[in-house]
Amino acid sequence: MEKDFWQGVREALPTALGYISIGLACGVVASPYLSPLEMALMSVLVYAGAAQFAMISLIAAHSSILNMALTVCLINLRNMLMSLHTSSDFKDASLAQTIGIGSLLTDESYGVYLSEKLKTDTITVPWMHGNNLVGYVAWIGATVIGTALGSLLPDPKAFGLDFALVAMFIGIFAAQFQGMQLTEKTKTMLMLMVLLAVAVSFFLLLFFVSQPLAVLAATLIGCFVGVVCDARE
């Protein structure tokens, strides 16, 4: 039975709660520099948690627009590989549908997508739109509210909001790791190979680049290894 839009929404609701927590924190951090309207425009057009936190830091440092653009591009390079892998399930979708899916794909919605893939081989376009849109709406609303109420919550770390994104990733990964028991041995080996590629790449890159760049580069290498190995099966 094919799953519809609202089933995609329901599958993504737990991650939407994480979006709200980290979105509020992002809004609070941005409140000294951006108005709620400006924050809304940033969330609508950029829609990338890590990139938006980086942009806010650069705005606070009076950095150039070119520097901000390059930073956002570097941080979001991994989305290209995630979109490339996701597109394999939507080869019959229209151009507008694939652009819509790729534009709103995030680490979290990609994680929900992978978890769903452990249960079924059929992912529909409406389901994916539901998965993506619930996070999009939650993020925009949370960042705007956080910016508006920023003066009331001057230190988001005091409430542990800065850990919300990390906790969300842990939850998504735990669900996928548990799902390994339901997959064939080759899929389990693929997941372990990707994790190994990320770990080895990270430690080797530390000898040549800074830690933040090593994290980004290792993530991209892991995504590339996963896409290539998955395509060969």
Write out the residue ranges for each language-model feature:
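Membrane-interface elements of multi-pass transporters and channels
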Residues: V28, P32-L37, D89-A93, L152-K157, ...
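C-terminal ends of transmembrane helices
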Residues: L81-D89, L114-K117, I172-T183, V225-E233
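Alpha-helical transmembrane segments and their helix-entry boundary regions
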Residues: M39-M42, F53, M68-A69, A96-G100, ...
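Helix-loop-helix hairpins and the membrane-proximal interhelical loops
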Residues: M1-A48, M55-V72, N76, E233
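Alpha-helical transmembrane segments and their membrane-interface exit regions
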Residues: A48-A51, L74-L81, A167-A174, A218-A231
